[in-house]
Amino acid sequence: MFSCKKTDSYPDNNEKLLRILDDKIKNKKYYEIKKKNHIQKLKKEALLYKNNDSISYHLNNLIVEEYLGYQCDSAYIYSDKNKEIANRSNNEIWLYKNLLQRSVLLSTTGLFVESKEILDKINPEVLPKQLRFSYNSAYECLYSNLLDYSGGDSPYNKIYKNKLADYYNSAYKALKPGDPFYYLFLSHKNRIENNWSQAEQNVNKFLKTTLPGTRLHAIGSFCKAVIDAKLGNIDSQESCLIYSAISDIESSTKENRSMQDLAS
């Protein structure tokens, strides 16, 4: 198990971690097969329960989440199935959940206009309370991807950053302290406000709740690497980028931003 945490000898530790990363890269196919087998298992379960809307919706939702960051085109198929189930069942919560998940899929694949159209049609005042975080998180995903796509010189950067600050603030407030995502989004908010020391404390709290080898651990480790860079902790930054890259490979996540930063 590999986790982004402090060590007394970063240079030596980083050399070991890079060797582990090289080994993971060589065995990338193994993790992809493991991922595919897990998705196939979920698909078989979904077929078994195709006449049970509740279980079928839940399994389709899991399949979409597994495909997210891995093979988004396939995720749309199961998103469509859940839209059909939600409409047939006249289940408002399922329909909202499907719309929010769909918006994230769209913004992740660069379809920003379509993603925003979905979110703009949702009235947050009538949204079920348990979906408030997902709503703000979907907007955060949209503006975060827009910010990355636009690049550092875009005249829209300030607008996107202001929007991000709003949705970071709304997202963490929709959760209770103790929820893992509370600390992740509070850390994002700290970063926007240039409160980097507090951002580090909160992302560390989030990382403690994630399992190495998962997409969430990769995200948390990458966020910590960004914070370490701002704080001047260069060796720790490299460690966290390596941990993030390892978790990306083990979870078969295709985004690989940490790998790109390590190569630059």
Model-found features: residue ranges?
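A "functional boundary" signal
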Residues: 1-264
